[in-house]
UniProtKB/Swiss-Prot annotation:
Keyword tags: Ribonucleoprotein, Ribosomal protein
Recorded superkingdom: Bacteria
Biological processes, Gene Ontology terms: negative regulation of translation; translation
Upper lineage: Bacteria, Pseudomonadati, Pseudomonadota, Alphaproteobacteria, Rickettsiales
UniProt source species: Wolbachia sp. subsp. Drosophila simulans (strain wRi)
Chain's role: This protein is one of the early assembly proteins of the 50S ribosomal subunit, although it is not seen to bind rRNA by itself. It is important during the early stages of 50S assembly.
Alphabetized Pfam families for the sequence: Ribosomal_L13 (PF00572)
Name assigned to this protein: Large ribosomal subunit protein uL13
Family, per entry: Belongs to the universal ribosomal protein uL13 family.
InterPro entries with a match to the protein in the record: Ribosomal_uL13, Ribosomal_uL13_bac-type, Ribosomal_uL13_sf
Keyword Ribonucleoprotein applies: yes
GO-annotated cellular components: cytosolic large ribosomal subunit
Coiled-coil stretches: none
């Protein structure tokens, strides 16, 4: 029996929408990373972008477990000497772009490389309850009902 490899024409991408209100960030990010990679599909092929498109709404209403909201630190460097910047999830969620918390979590759960960057482009995160992808007729996923620990 030969090993099955998915061809470009055989890829069938679906659209999913997830309401992130009250959901735990890490659990949501792990689930979304699996959807973006396509690991939930039987025809998964590592070298092809066979994952689905995911829309996340209400990104500003996510939760962290424990004291991570205040104690977790995100680092970034400006490229200049002494340019190490620190911020907390609380600052980001109360700032101008609260959807970046989920974007960073999902991006860091994907592998590195050009394929991961292409897969990450299939993620659409919105801080409000509205999104502009109604034409794709996304399928709603009730992530909170999958496990009691998913919602806080």
């Amino acid at each position: 029996m030969k090993t099955f490899f998915l061809k470009e024409k055989q890829i069938n991408k679906k659209w999913f929408v997830i309401d992130a209100e009250g959901l735990v960030v890490g659990r949501l990010a792990a689930f979304v990373a699996t959807l973006l990679r396509g690991k939930h599909k039987p025809e998964y092929t590592p070298h092809m972008d066979c994952g689905d498109n995911v829309i996340i709404i209400n990104a500003e209403k996510v939760h962290f477990t424990g004291k991570k909201l205040k104690d977790k630190i995100y680092y970034k460097h400006t490229g200049y000497s002494g340019g190490l910047k620190k911020t907390t999830p609380d600052n980001i969620l109360n700032g101008k772009f609260p959807e970046r918390v989920i974007e960073m979590a999902v991006k860091r759960m994907l592998d590195d490389g050009p394929m991961a960057r292409r897969r990450f482009e299939n993620l659409y995160v919105y801080s409000g309850s509205e999104h502009k992808h109604q034409g794709q007729q996304p399928e709603k996923i009730d992530f909170a009902s999958l496990n009691r620990k998913n919602k806080k």
